[in-house]
């Protein structure tokens, strides 16, 4: 899908024509459509009927193949868990990988070494690039250092700083700006999203995240925020109430809550949770800035392990006990 806020960055890339570098790293915040921008560029590079500086025509054979996911000169590299065409090995219980594995990169090495099918460029799209494991990243680096002619690597990363510096240095970085609030609101209105302003605020201005919040998400968020805003906060009872809630959601919501506490303490404003602005203001007034910043940094650090807690119940209890400790520091 193409998004209206991509018009300018896509046109700028297409205007470079043959001067486009062999490797681009699309980086930036999650939920603004970096992957869609990279896909639009891939379609344009492989289109056989477009004029210079124009987008893919959408009608030629190459465009039809891209629509069907079968273009012979295009490869998508992503973790098994994201692959729509994943075919589990017969007779195995192996879970789909969260990483891009070295075997996948080796397959790409064979692909780019072959003669092109359509006498045009080859395109490799890697998403999310930060999911490359160490061995896969090292194997990819060899391809980036000595790329075959007319081969384009398009890497997309939310947490680009997790990529090895050697890979980042081989790519020209593309940092698409998020849409303006007005543009995001207009787009969300066309998606028939209820309470678009709250969703957009909670998504930090990222419209694709805003539209992804479903009823179950809002219900679980409400359970969490009601629990932590009780006059007498009970961490263990709150953990029990959220026993079926994904730890990643709890950490994300708490991180946004803590960010709002810090923001209100410094600026008097609330970003992610405008529907709880009064409670945030009252809580921030009671807490010290140093303690709030320390707690926020702790939550940010938990993002690295939240996907695989050894014991979910204990993880939630510890998480909420730490918030209770923050409240006890109230001045």
Where are these regions (language model features)?
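Charged, glycine-rich active-site and insertion segments that engage polyanionic ligands
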Residues: 1-44, 52, 61, 149-152, ...
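Clamp-loader machinery-focused feature within the broader ASCE/P-loop NTPase space
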Residues: 1-135
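Hydrophobic residues in beta-strands of the RecA-like P-loop NTPase core, especially within AAA+ ATPase
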Residues: 26, 126, 140-141, 157
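Arginine/glycine-rich "motif VI" loop of SF2 helicases in the C-terminal RecA-like domain
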Residues: 68, 146, 193
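Proline-centered helix-kink/hinge sites
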Residues: 72, 116, 147-148, 179
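N-terminal functional module detector in eukaryotic proteins
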Residues: 75, 83, 129-138, 145, ...
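Conserved catalytic/switch belt of AAA+ P-loop NTPases
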Residues: 113, 138-152
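Loop/turn-to-beta-strand initiation segments
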Residues: 119-123, 148-154
């Amino acid at each position: 899908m193409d998004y209206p806020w991509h018009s300018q960055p896509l046109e700028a890339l297409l205007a470079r024509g043959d001067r486009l570098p062999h490797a681009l790293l699309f980086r930036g915040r999650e939920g603004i459509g970096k992957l869609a921008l990279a896909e639009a560029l891939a379609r344009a590079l492989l289109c056989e009927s477009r004029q210079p500086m124009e987008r893919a025509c959408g009608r030629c054979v190459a465009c039809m193949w891209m629509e069907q996911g079968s273009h012979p000169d295009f490869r998508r590299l992503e973790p098994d868990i994201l692959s729509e065409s994943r075919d589990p090995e017969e007779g195995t219980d192996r879970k789909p990988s969260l990483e891009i594995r070295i075997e996948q990169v080796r397959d790409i090495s064979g692909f780019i070494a072959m003669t092109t099918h359509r006498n045009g460029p080859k395109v490799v799209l890697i998403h999310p690039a930060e999911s490359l494991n160490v061995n896969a990243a090292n194997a990819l680096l060899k391809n980036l250092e000595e790329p075959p002619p007319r081969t384009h690597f398009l890497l997309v990363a939310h947490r680009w700083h997790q990529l090895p510096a050697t890979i980042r240095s081989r790519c020209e970085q593309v940092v698409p700006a998020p849409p303006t609030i007005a543009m995001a609101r207009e787009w969300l209105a066309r998606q028939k999203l209820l309470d678009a302003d709250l969703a957009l605020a909670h998504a930090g201005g990222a419209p694709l995240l805003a539209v992804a919040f479903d009823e179950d998400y809002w219900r679980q968020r409400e359970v969490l925020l009601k629990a932590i805003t009780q006059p007498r906060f009970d961490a263990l009872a709150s953990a029990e109430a959220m026993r079926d809630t994904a730890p990643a959601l709890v950490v994300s919501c708490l991180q946004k809550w803590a960010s709002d506490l810090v923001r209100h303490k410094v600026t008097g404003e609330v970003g992610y949770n405008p529907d709880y602005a009064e409670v945030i203001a009252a809580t921030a007034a009671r807490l010290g800035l140093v303690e709030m910043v320390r707690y926020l940094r702790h939550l940010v650090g938990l993002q690295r392990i939240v996907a695989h807690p050894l014991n979910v119940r204990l993880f939630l209890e510890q998480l909420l006990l730490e918030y209770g400790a923050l409240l006890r520091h109230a001045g």
